[in-house]
From Swiss-Prot:
This is Bone morphogenetic protein receptor type-1B. One of its GO terms (cellular component) is plasma membrane. It comes from Homo sapiens (Human). It is an enzyme of class 2 (transferase). ATP binds at I210, G211, K212, G213, R214, Y215, G216, E217, V218, K231. The gene is BMPR1B. One of its GO terms (molecular function) is metal ion binding. Autophosphorylated. InterPro entries: Activin_recp, GS_dom, Kinase-like_dom_sf, Prot_kinase_dom, Protein_kinase_ATP_BS, Ser-Thr/Tyr_kinase_cat_dom, Ser/Thr_kinase_AS, Snake_toxin-like_sf. On ligand binding, forms a receptor complex consisting of two type II and two type I transmembrane serine/threonine kinases. Type II receptors phosphorylate and activate type I receptors which autophosphorylate, then bind and activate SMAD transcriptional regulators. Receptor for BMP7/OP-1 and GDF5. Positively regulates chondrocyte differentiation through GDF5 interaction.
Amino acid sequence: MLLRSAGKLNVGTKKEDGESTAPTPRPKVLRCKCHHHCPEDSVNNICSTDGYCFTMIEEDDSGLPVVTSGCLGLEGSDFQCRDTPIPHQRRSIECCTERNECNKDLHPTLPPLKNRDFVDGPIHHRALLISVTVCSLLLVLIILFCYFRYKRQETRPRYSIGLEQDETYIPPGESLRDLIEQSQSSGSGSGLPLLVQRTIAKQIQMVKQIGKGRYGEVWMGKWRGEKVAVKVFFTTEEASWFRETEIYQTVLMRHENILGFIAADIKGTGSWTQLYLITDYHENGSLYDYLKSTTLDAKSMLKLAYSSVSGLCHLHTEIFSTQGKPAIAHRDLKSKNILVKKNGTCCIADLGLAVKFISDTNEVDIPPNTRVGTKRYMPPEVLDESLNRNHFQSYIMADMYSFGLILWEVARRCVSGGIVEEYQLPYHDLVPSDPSYEDMREIVCIKKLRPSFPNRWSSDECLRQMGKLMTECWAHNPASRLTALRVKKTLAKMSESQDIKL
């Protein structure tokens, strides 16, 4: 009989339970052909054994097949004929006891080639070496590319917008006023088309920084020779940028007393992202800056007050039409967020905290923003956390409290009888320069104090009426405060009574 083995080849007969066993050889001497495995006493390449004859094929170190044959002793031959595989070595053995020199007829073959058989081969070593070298070179090139690109960006001005001469969407000679008028007459009323906004953003040249706040920086820039203001938001203030852009592009939002919106864009420069909001430029700056350096007469005071409340009234008013405008509350009114134009009128800016009222669903649309308003201008219901956040009118009345404080700032700078007070912030004499919630809560909610009036106001009719107006704006009870429309009408009557044309 033949006993064949290649890898884990079963040798012998099977028992009833399926287990393979080696047959018990006959107790006689068996002669076998031997090659490369001949003992010293062999004659004519013949050896003798009481076990098995075998023939084996295996692969040498160079990968060539080598055939050997010989005798296996009875002891341990069962295990040897099973030929337990050796890792990374190709080998096959066949055994027999049928007759003398029976292994002449055995022709074992190498087991099929497996990928792992080449792990230690010289060809694989060369391939591995080449692969590692190529990958290392590519990695070095990528690192060098990234490094030089980073250094190139570092050498550029921090806030420069690439001047890509893309005139496809903006014909030469078109001014910003032309573009805005065209969008109002033929568009949706929600601002310039997005593609035009992006083109303007690409073509702006940044000139100088003119301001800095908690949200980012303000730059004066130029587009085709026209001055514009570019508000550059910190990446942490993306929610404010998104909200302000959204509010400015609300249908029918444009108004002479709301800061004129031009464009918004996100500029990626590799190592950082810049959020741009481009608006009209007003060289007088904020009302806060203007009042610090400028004194007023009755006409200029009323002009500042009337134009400011006109912008606020437009914000607060819902417009019903096929393309209507929702009512909007500012939520961060202060003199630093109102700008002064060349003609002495004001416009309201910084709408990053604004809240909208959706009348169709009776829903208050509050921005997902961690930023809060300015503590000095917060009304009592915000300071003591009693404001009803689900009632839009609560936000409107909170704005009116803040506006009353702004009127006080303006009126103090109006000259009467040759006397004028220096500019001061509201509650300057009652709280520190950077008050805490507790500071403001104690003064506004607990002690119920408000900014004091100079004695001279009582002898000047215009200032006396202004004092009465602001008192009704900052009343402790929100329901008792005047609306923006009522303040606007009152200021118009005051101007008319003094023959002042606004």
